[in-house]
Amino acid sequence: MSYVAAEPGVLISPTDDLQSPRSAPAAHDENADGITGGTRDDSAPNSRFQLGRRIPEATAQEGFLVRPFTQQCQIIHTEGDHAVIGVSPGNSYFSRQRLRDLGLWGLTNFDRVDFVYTDVHVAESYEALGDSAIEARRKAVKNIRGVRAKITTTVNELDPAGARLCVRPMSEFQSNEAYRELHADLLTRLKDDEDLRAVCQDLVRRFLSTKVGPRQGATATQEQVCMDYICAEAPLFLDTPAILGVPSSLNCYHQSLPLAEMLYARGSGLRASRNQGHAIVTPDGSPAE
């Protein structure tokens, strides 16, 4: 795989609140912002990872504010080869109009755009959080079907031939060799990489703190389901160019990825490939959530 340790001075990482725990906000819908959705807090330093010197400014484009995570991410954004727009099922943020607007933004600024929606470990997540197996399956099918229909409508309207705008479920990548290698390597690293394990465990704890009462506490099953969810999505944060065969790619979401500070930090360890970027894309006039 082509993801490597960053050279000093090449990748610059701002901070989010991953290592600065605080009370988590209440979830606003069934899947909230997904397990890998997070928040960004530039006011608190992070002692685990070395920070950079300058964070790119947000740019207004087609009704959105685009905030590349690092200077290298800004270059990838400017190159405009490819973008992944992540969509989580059961999240009211992704309305039909919002998806259409994101599709227009993507087509205006990138040669190719892929909407990627989560359809793996969804039912397991609902069941782990208390639904019966039957109810969890019903809820997952309903939410996945709904988000797929909305994205498909957008793609058919904006690019009927599918030449530049596509929709892909996460499950599609399970037969992709590059994805499988990235996923297998990630599982191996979780056993030995202290930083990676700490970041993922903290992410799991933060997510479950919004779902499980403080007196009840999270179970081992709940923690494992969350970890599986994270590991399923992480390869796209590491090296989408290797997975989809594009020169470079910008992973876009309306929140900062909690893994981003580690993936774009200086030094050794698990890092995103040099042609993999991340940007926070929010409706114009709203802060990065």
Swiss-Prot record:
The keyword Transferase applies. Residues 1-48 are annotated as: Disordered. The active site is at S88. It is an enzyme of class 2 (transferase). GO terms for molecular function: aminoacyltransferase activity; ligase activity, forming carbon-oxygen bonds. The record marks K139, Y229 as: Could be involved in aa-tRNA binding. Its EC number is 2.3.2.21. This is Cyclo(L-tyrosyl-L-tyrosyl) synthase. InterPro entries: CDPS, CDPS_sf. It holds the Pfam family CDPS. Homodimer.
